[in-house]
């Protein structure tokens, strides 16, 4: 959660248990894709199925 606050929290969306706007609980395929808000880049419909969908945002250890 500490890393989430730093990286994703800084984006204002969060991902993987943090959720800056309440969307990033665990980046599950179903929940977020149904909402149309990919975690990490909320509002742009990034597939939250895989970490790599965030491009460079998760490059720290998931890309």
Swiss-Prot record:
Pfam families: KRTAP. Keywords: Keratin, Repeat. GO terms for cellular component: cytosol; intermediate filament. Coiled coil: none annotated. The keyword ATP-binding does not apply. The keyword Repeat applies. It comes from the Eukaryota. InterPro entries: KRTAP_type8/19/20/21/22, KRTAP_type_19. Interacts with hair keratins. Belongs to the KRTAP type 19 family. In the hair cortex, hair keratin intermediate filaments are embedded in an interfilamentous matrix, consisting of hair keratin-associated proteins (KRTAP), which are essential for the formation of a rigid and resistant hair shaft through their extensive disulfide bond cross-linking with abundant cysteine residues of hair keratins. The matrix proteins include the high-sulfur and high-glycine-tyrosine keratins. This is Keratin-associated protein 19-7. It comes from Homo sapiens.
């Amino acid at each position: 959660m500490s890393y989430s606050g730093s990286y994703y929290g800084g984006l204002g969306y969060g991902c993987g248990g943090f959720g800056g706007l309440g969307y990033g609980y665990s980046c599950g395929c179903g929940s977020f894709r149904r909402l149309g808000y990919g975690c990490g880049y909320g509002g742009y419909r990034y597939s939250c199925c895989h970490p790599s969908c965030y491009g460079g945002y998760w490059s720290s250890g998931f890309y």
